[in-house]
UniProtKB/Swiss-Prot annotation:
Domain Helicase C-terminal, first and last residues per copy: 190-349
Residue ranges of every copy of the Helicase ATP-binding domain listed in the record: 26-179
Catalyzed chemical reaction(s): ATP + H2O = ADP + phosphate + H(+)
One GO MF term attached to the UniProt entry: ATP hydrolysis activity
InterPro entries reported in the protein's UniProt record: DEAD/DEAH_box_helicase_dom, Helicase_ATP-bd, Helicase_C-like, P-loop_NTPase
Family affiliation: Belongs to the DEAD box helicase family.
Assigned keywords, A-Z: ATP-binding, Helicase, Hydrolase, Nucleotide-binding, RNA-binding
UniProt key word Ion transport: no
Protein name: Probable ATP-dependent RNA helicase MG308 homolog
Motif DEVD box, residue range(s) on this chain: 126-129
SUPFAM superfamilies membership: P-loop containing nucleoside triphosphate hydrolases
Record PANTHER family: RNA HELICASE
Length: 409
């Protein structure tokens, strides 16, 4: 796809020289056709729909031309943040969360404040499977039918979209091109799953052991409901542990402040409800702990996907408890392999099936080219050349870890 100059400038600023597989596949059809995009969490679905839509924006026309619907405020704030970065290179581009503005692109929740504009030609539903749940399906159908009056092109994106949900979309929008880059809906190649055997001890003892084991990492702790979250945060506070919690009962300003702090790497332990399991980018977090299992099975995949983003490895922990066995059996049948971890009496963790060597990081073609360039510079053998070469390559990997990989949005 050929991008207009402002988008080329943005891509250059963010050092994006290649696109992920879902982006390349979607670029071939969107926004000329209605599309469904399915790919792993952290694979770059946001840019897959956002860049082509922005490529069609006419900034001389001060009217809404594209809209992105999202299921949570956190995801809305995240996309608006990305768009504000793009605006620095895209002179004249206006974005908003309100339909009563003259912004070119609107990012919004589904609700009563939707205003139909005949100039809107591109409509996206991110994390569309959430809109297809029983509690919100009727509202989603009404929204789709409202915009169909002016025949825009639709985009539907998610990490988990099953056949039944796909058929629901087909009933409303046709023709439809499906781009499926995720052949195994229940598995993520960069997530390691662990089942913690408590050996008769309390779950909170297991949680403390995990927090101690990962004391140098940022940790997300998921709770399935408000009661569970309240009980856990009370235990953490009683034990004088430092943490933040994010859930639907907070005010929008409170939620935004905590979310921003977590995204900016100033929160080590974040206790959250499942509202944060969808589409959110928290690049500094590498560990997920499910204090309890989600009510909707597929939400477990979205939970674990919070820490396997930007080609980074992530660890996801579940407690081996009697009331979890039914769901764990279903997860196993879906192909999720859990490594066994044991909580010792002294509070340490034993990983009998886990090799302690670090996983090799995924290497992009851009990084491979840079490594080849370093090696090519040492054609003549000089004293300590291997040591200097190794140090330069190590610095490359360190820089990659520090810099956010924008292409995976």
């Amino acid at each position: 796809m050929h991008f207009i100059q402002p988008l080329q400038a943005f891509l250059q600023t963010k050092h994006i020289v290649e696109f992920s597989s879902i982006q390349q596949a979607v670029f071939k059809v969107w926004p000329r056709q209605n599309v469904v995009g399915i790919a792993e969490t952290g694979s770059g679905k946001t840019f897959a729909y956002l860049l082509p839509a922005l490529n069609q924006i006419d900034v001389t026309l001060n009217k809404p031309q594209a809209v992105v619907f999202v299921p949570t405020k956190e995801l809305k704030w995240q996309i608006l943040t990305i768009l504000n970065d793009i605006k620095a290179s895209f002179t004249g581009l206006k974005v908003s969360e309100n339909f009563n503005s003259n912004a070119h692109l609107i990012v919004s929740l589904i609700g009563k404040d939707i205003i139909l504009h005949e100039t809107i030609k591109y409509v996206v539903f991110d994390e569309v499977d959430m809109f297809l749940e029983d509690s919100s399906q009727a509202e989603w159908i009404n929204c789709v039918q409202l915009f169909q009056k002016h025949k825009p092109h639709f985009g539907f994106f998610s990490a988990t979209l099953f056949n039944e949900q796909l058929q629901q979309i087909r009933k409303q929008v046709a023709p439809l091109t499906v781009v499926n880059q995720k052949k195994r809906a229940w598995k993520h190649s960069l997530v390691k799953h662990f089942l913690l055997n408590l050996n008769g001890q309390e779950p909170f003892a297991g949680l403390l052991a995990l927090l101690n084991y990962h004391h140098n990492e940022q940790v997300l702790v998921f709770c399935s409901n408000a009661k569970s979250l309240k009980q856990l945060t009370s235990l953490l506070a009683h034990n004088q542990l430092s943490f933040k919690s994010l859930h639907g009962q907070l005010t929008p300003n409170e939620r935004k402040h905590i979310f921003t702090s977590a995204a900016n790497n100033t929160v080590r332990v974040l206790v959250v409800s499942d509202l944060l399991a969808r589409g959110i980018d928290l690049p500094h977090f590498s560990v997920v702990i499910s204090w309890d299992l989600p009510l909707v099975d597929s939400f477990y995949i979205h939970r674990s996907g919070r820490v396997a983003r930007f080609n980074s490895w992530g660890n996801s922990y579940v407690f081996d408890l009697p009331h979890n066995q039914h769901k764990l059996t279903k997860f196993a049948h879906k192909g999720i392999l859990f490594n066994s971890v044991h909580l010792e009496r002294d509070g340490t963790l034993k990983f009998p099936q886990l090799k302690q060597s670090k996983q090799k990081p995924a290497v992009s073609s851009e990084l491979k080219t840079a490594i080849k360039r370093i090696k090519a510079g040492y054609k003549k053998v000089k004293p300590n050349y291997k040591k200097r070469q190794k140090q330069q390559i190590a610095e490359l990997f360190a820089k990659r870890k520090q810099r956010r990989s924008w292409k995976n949005f």
